[in-house]
Amino acid sequence: MEASPNDRLHFGKMGFGCKHYKRRCQIRAPCCNEVFDCRHCHNESTSTLRNIYDRHDLVRQDVKQVICSVCDTEQPAAQVCSNCGVNMGEYFCSICIFYDDDTEKQQFHCDDCGICRVGGRENFFHCKKCGSCYAVGLRNNHRCVENSMRHHCPICYEYLFDSLKDTNVMKCGHTMHVECYNEMIKRDKFCCPICSRSVIDMSKTWQRLDEEIEATAMPSDYRDKKVWILCNDCNDTTEVHFHIIGQKCGHCRSYNTRAIAPPVLPQ
């Protein structure tokens, strides 16, 4: 008994692919005319070439030809194989030339980002100033930084915009990978590597520093010494009494401060 057209479409689902995606086709990279399982496989391969001038990334939209993994037929990019009739990807984006059999990821294409995302369209919104899709919980609930996602992670330096790893938006609006953020916190680093703002609530730490300073008298030579500081949390500049333990911002009460030269007053 012959398989129905619908059964044929789903033949081999989740049975092919690479470590990045389950799909029933390979792509021919137009930049080097080589065949790879996916764009990431291409980029990983070319990034290790001996000659640095040969290293390059594949532009996803440039892919024109794919090879069906079921029947090995090379053909123009499309969802259904022109020869054997299988879906080469249960999810297919004709803009990104993106195939994926694992639809539990809830893939969707964002026109503003220009690429496909995962997690379900209803769970995300596109922030035009930050230049990327964010979880709906961040709508009107994050500090906008222009094109904040179109940068490299400040810890591992992987480009964030199209990274496969989860990304964290910090209180300051800057972004980094979730795993890099967690590792940073684990190592007792609580400031953004880019702007130095505190990334978590530090009020209890500031309270402990208040108590330490109150219990630690400075030598008489330093009791009246004052310094100018810049607060990394509120960007205010103030003149405060110097203390070896730390200088407290007179505006927001943070100890995340640094000494600066006195301001030059206009003549």
Swiss-Prot record:
SUPFAM superfamilies: CHY zinc finger-like (SSF161219), RING/U-box (SSF57850), Zinc hairpin stack (SSF161245)
The protein's name in its UniProt record: E3 ubiquitin-protein ligase MIEL1
Cellular component GO terms held in the UniProt record: cytoplasm; nucleus
Pathway assignment: Protein modification; protein ubiquitination
Segments passing through the bilayer: none
UniProt feature coiled coil, ranges: none
Modification(s) after translation: Autoubiquitinated.
Binding site for Zn(2+) 6: 127, 130, 142, 144
Chief location of this protein within or outside the cell: cytoplasm
Zinc fingers typed RING-type, residue spans: 153-196
Modified residues (Phosphoserine): 163, 198
Quaternary structure, from the entry: Interacts with MYB30. Interacts with GILP.
Reaction equation(s) it catalyzes: S-ubiquitinyl-[E2 ubiquitin-conjugating enzyme]-L-cysteine + [acceptor protein]-L-lysine = [E2 ubiquitin-conjugating enzyme]-L-cysteine + N(6)-ubiquitinyl-[acceptor protein]-L-lysine
InterPro entries: RCHY1_zinc-ribbon, Znf_CHY, Znf_CHY_sf, Znf_CTCHY, Znf_CTCHY_sf, Znf_RING, Znf_RING/FYVE/PHD
Any one GO BP annotation for this protein: defense response
UniProt-reported outcome of changing residue 174 to A: Loss of activity
Keyword vocabulary terms for this entry: Cytoplasm, Metal-binding, Nucleus, Phosphoprotein, Plant defense, Transferase, Ubl conjugation, Ubl conjugation pathway, Zinc, Zinc-finger
Binding sites annotated in the UniProt record for Zn(2+) 4: 93, 96, 109, 116
GO molecular function: ubiquitin-protein transferase activity; zinc ion binding
CTCHY-type zinc-finger residues: 88-152
Residues reported to bind Zn(2+) 5: 110, 113, 126, 133
Positions of CHY-type zinc fingers: 11-86
Reported function: E3 ubiquitin-protein ligase that acts as a regulator of cell death and defense. E3 ubiquitin ligases accept ubiquitin from an E2 ubiquitin-conjugating enzyme in the form of a thioester and then directly transfers the ubiquitin to targeted substrates. Attenuates the activation of defense and related cell death responses in the absence of pathogens by mediating ubiquitination and subsequent proteasomal degradation of MYB30.
